[in-house]
Swiss-Prot record:
Its EC number is 3.5.1.88. One of its GO terms (molecular function) is metal ion binding. InterPro entries: Peptide_deformylase (IPR023635), Peptide_deformylase_sf (IPR036821). It catalyses: N-terminal N-formyl-L-methionyl-[peptide] + H2O = N-terminal L-methionyl-[peptide] + formate. Keywords: Hydrolase, Iron, Metal-binding, Protein biosynthesis. This is Peptide deformylase. Belongs to the polypeptide deformylase family. Signal peptide: none annotated. It comes from Actinobacillus pleuropneumoniae serotype 7 (strain AP76). Fe cation binds at C91, H133, H137.
Amino acid sequence: MSVLEVVLYPDEGLAKVCEPVAQVDDELNQFIDDMFDTMYEHEGIGLAAPQVGVLKRVITIDIEGDKTNQVVLINPEILESCGETGIEEGCLSIPGHRALVPRKEKVKVKALNRKGEEVIYEADGLFAICIQHEIDHLNGVLFVDHISALKRQRIKEKMQKLKKQIERAK
């Protein structure tokens, strides 16, 4: 298991639509373990594969962060959604920035688990918000795409400066 490098906004890979996973195997499960390690290392509650540079439809979630309720969604698809909600969201690919994002209050999602079995989750609250946020990543959408162009541009400029600082420090 290892911690992977998190891709930072405005990296072009974060704006790409991910390919479905064709086969759930040992290699994918190792990658999922690495995704969880990365998510915990950065104190996140969700992580999508494109955030670590892999354009596949894989999500890891652990709302509590205690490793007892790990959720893996492979090729997730929202079947139903209802209600309106929203919270200030953050993102491991956009550290230090948050914004209020409108979301559905409840979602029903179908996916494969890490054994390749079909699972269905009926989620609400933070779990539903996290699912929507991570599925957005799989579709090349970030939380900043839900905010005004001016705010998005300010965040983009700050993130470009941060990326330059990180590159110089290497």
